[in-house]
Curated annotation (Swiss-Prot):
GO terms for cellular component: axon; dendrite; extracellular space; synaptic vesicle. This is Beta-nerve growth factor. The gene is NGF. Belongs to the NGF-beta family. The lineage of its organism: Eukaryota, Metazoa, Chordata, Craniata, Vertebrata. Pfam families: NGF. It comes from Pongo pygmaeus.
Length: 241
């Protein structure tokens, strides 16, 4: 709303400077035609109508989108060293069902740019044979609202949420895995002899290549994301008589 206000003020000031205050200030043969004032008035009326009809929130969102609209060359995604099975650029959210968690899916006829050959990922507890259990319960989800992350140098960087590729807006998704519960059972990890061991489940991390902001330009960086849930063991102190 403030940008439209400044535009109206600028146009108004230009009109004041051009308006003749008296006949003596206007050189002979250089009078401003009436059509100029009519056109200026029409432009001001149109701008006022748009300002009244457009919500302030919509204007702010549009301006923010223009400042964050980063165009990326699609040839960047053809470099094998920049591909990661845990990073995906897509126009729509990836499927969440366990039986459709395919990284090679296509949305709206356009395949993701950084598609890989890894077939499926389960978004819930992995499937085991009868009688087999996992020592820790994990949950895996596609994260599409990541704004900041820690890079490989330990610095906090800004992650690009959306990029413009071939005039289409692609969102950057990260496939993250974390522990569902640090203690799946009362004693800690499942199946651990609590008489001799202390145990608990913890989320581990790895670094993946992602598009981040470097000043006013997009840049590839290694950022840390959650990738696994493991059991940590420590031997209990032996009590001697």
């Amino acid at each position: 709303m403030s940008m439209l206000f400044y535009t109206l003020i600028t146009a108004f000031l230009i009109g004041i400077q051009a308006e003749p205050h008296s006949e003596s200030n206007v050189p002979a043969g250089h009078t401003i035609p009436q059509a100029h004032w009519t056109k200026l008035q029409h432009s001001l009326d149109t701008a006022l109508r748009r300002a009244r009809s457009t919500p302030a929130a919509a204007i702010a969102a549009r301006v923010a989108g223009q400042t964050c609209n980063i165009t990326v060359d699609p040839r960047l995604f053809k470099k094998r060293r920049l591909r990661s099975p845990r990073v995906l650029f897509s126009t729509q959210p990836p499927p969440e069902a366990a039986d459709t968690q395919d990284l090679d899916f296509e949305v709206g006829g356009a395949a993701p740019f950084n598609r890989t050959h890894r077939s499926k990922r389960s978004s819930s507890h992995p499937i085991f044979h009868r009688g087999e259990f996992s020592v820790c319960d994990s949950v895996s989800v596609w994260v599409g609202d990541k704004t900041t992350a820690t890079d490989i140098k330990g610095k906090e960087v800004m992650v690009l949420g959306e990029v413009n590729i071939n005039n289409s807006v692609f969102k950057q998704y990260f496939f993250e895995t974390k522990c569902r519960d640090p203690n799946p059972v009362d004693s800690g990890c499942r199946g651990i002899d609590s008489k001799h061991w202390n145990s608990y489940c913890t989320t581990t991390h790895t670094f993946v290549k992602a598009l981040t902001m470097d000043g006013k330009q997009a840049a590839w960086r290694f950022i840390r994301i959650d990738t696994a849930c493991v059991c940590v063991l420590s031997r209990k102190a032996v009590r001697r008589a």
